[in-house]
Regions:
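Loop/turn elements at helix/coil->beta-strand transitions in domains of secreted/extracellular proteins
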Residues: 4-6, 40-44, 68
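Structural signal for short hydrophobic segments within the conserved structured cores
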Residues: 6-8, 26, 81
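Acidic Gly/Asp/Thr-rich repetitive segments characteristic of extracellular carbohydrate-active
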Residues: 12-48, 53-54
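Short, T/G/N/S-enriched strand-turn elements that build extracellular solenoid repeat scaffolds
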Residues: 32-38, 53-64, 82-85, 273
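Right-handed parallel beta-helix/beta-spiral solenoid domain characteristic of secreted/periplasmic
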Residues: 46, 65-145, 171-182
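Extracellular beta-strand/beta-solenoid scaffold signature
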Residues: 57-60, 91-115, 138-158, 180-203, ...
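Right-handed parallel beta-helix
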Residues: 69, 76-78, 120-131, 160-176, ...
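C-terminal accessory segments
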Residues: 435-436
């Protein structure tokens, strides 16, 4: 018997929730109506261009298949359909254990405009998403108990290994989350793995196959794009990271490409606990803009007033290429790139400019086997290189255009070991690039 795939149409302009939603002439009116629909492989949800879904959200826990993914996108002409969650779409996040830093928050309510919960083989594209404070709720922007918010949250918990998560051409902005809660689903796009209710039955919660591409993310807090924080973090202690650990407990086949992140309150783009993730052709501008005493003023015991641009956390053989980072704001980090507690990170063919914390850091004792080559740094500030307690790093054939008075090694972050070979260092007078 031939499978009948359904397409659900939704229009805030011409729809009615009493319609069947199965044609452009009989669309639903609200996203709430979709929550009554069970989705099957090959099904589609299409929102009409020009529609605005105010105080609404879309939470999905159904899955497609490798051959027939579920698709959520747009139809018609005009502006992308808009989902303005405004603090709705609240769900409870719980890692089921303390995080790698016990001071970090590991459970609590989260508001997500789009939530994929144990859903796989699903493609979301061509939507505009915001998640600000509700007009009926008074929330101080930097309050310690401010609601965690996401544009798009993806969660693995009770479905074992999730495959085929594809996000493309999303415009996500004005997501006013909690700036202090680093590892809650908090920011533009954030994917996490939580402790399963019965891991012996469902298997380890993890991701194998994530593609985030052509997305624009701006004015979000805390993270721009983060993929892969996991309840299994204790499996990844130490400097040498075994491939087998990632195949069983970490993330695989993570590709983040051609995304733009601007004015994230904290970090721009970070794959986490991933084996050979590829992060390429992305741009970040003016991020870490809330890592300052004016905004980050009530952290309590959470600390965490640090952020960098495009970097990995606890990954093995991560590749970063053809990325660009500008104007990172100064904090304890504040550099464009950061090989952080990973094994075998490779940065090549990247560009950085006027980042207040410098070009690149090799962060602490568990940052090993890292290579930084064929990159260009123009007028980065604060100190170009930050070998901070790392045992090794190979820095070769890069071009550094350094403003007079800016040190090659950042002060108080230069006690690690690096090997410098065939780098071109040119002194410049000022930000306009005039040579001395």
């Amino acid at each position: 018997m031939k499978m009948q795939y359904r397409t659900y149409y939704v229009s805030s302009e011409t729809g009615n929730d009493c319609y069947d939603g199965l044609s452009k002439t009989t669309p639903f009116a609200t996203l709430k109506r979709l929550q009554q629909c069970k989705l099957y492989p090959g099904d589609q949800i299409l929102l009409e261009c020009g529609s605005v879904f105010e105080d609404q959200y879309l939470h999905i826990s159904d899955s497609g298949s490798k051959e027939l993914p579920i698709e959520i996108g747009a139809y018609g002409n005009g502006a992308l359909p808009k989902i303005h969650a405004n603090g709705t779409g609240i769900w409870y996040q719980d890692y089921g254990m303390l995080l790698d830093s016990p001071a970090h928050v590991y459970r609590g309510n989260v508001s997500s405009a789009i939530l994929l919960y144990d859903a796989q083989y699903i493609w979301i594209h061509d939507l505009e998403i915001t998640n600000q404070e509700s007009f009926t709720t008074i929330e101080a922007y930097c309050a310690p108990d401010k609601m965690d918010r996401t544009g798009v949250a993806v969660v693995a918990q009770n479905g074992g290994t999730l495959h085929g998560i594809h996000l493309s051409n999303l415009m996500i902005h004005d997501v006013n989350g909690n700036v202090y809660n680093k590892h809650m689903n908090n920011g533009g796009i954030y994917m996490t793995a939580l402790k399963p209710e019965n891991e012996k039955v469902t298997g380890v919660a993890r991701f194998d196959g994530v593609l985030v591409e052509d997305c624009s993310v701006w004015r979000v807090s805390r993270w721009g794009i983060a993929v892969g924080y996991t309840y299994q973090h204790a499996r990844f202690t130490g400097a040498e990271l075994a491939e087998e650990t990632f195949l069983q407990y970490g993330q695989e086949h993570i590709l983040l490409r051609n995304n733009y992140v601007k004015e994230a309150g904290g970090d721009a783009i970070t794959p986490m606990y991933a084996l050979r993730p590829v992060t390429e052709h992305n741009s970040a501008d003016s991020c870490a803009c809330e890592m300052n005493d004016h905004v980050y003023c009530h952290p309590g015991e959470r600390m965490g007033k640090v952020a960098a641009g495009i970097w990995p956390w606890k990954c093995k053989d991560a590749v970063f290429r053809y990325n660009e980072v500008r104007d990172m704001k100064l904090n304890q980090d504040g550099m464009a790139y950061d090989a952080d507690s990973g094994d075998g990170t490779l940065y090549e063919y990247n560009y950085s400019s006027q980042n207040e914390g410098g070009c690149v850091m090799f962060c602490l004792e568990e940052a090993i086997h890292n290579t930084f080559r064929y990159n260009v740094s123009v007028d980065d500030l604060g100190g170009i290189l930050s070998p901070s307690g790392n045992p090794d790093a190979y820095v070769a054939e890069n071009e550094f255009y350094v403003r007079r008075g800016v040190p090659l090694l950042r002060n108080q972050m230069s006690d690690g070991r690096i090997t410098l070979e065939k780098n071109k260092i040119t002194m410049i007078e000022n930000e306009n690039g005039g040579q001395r």
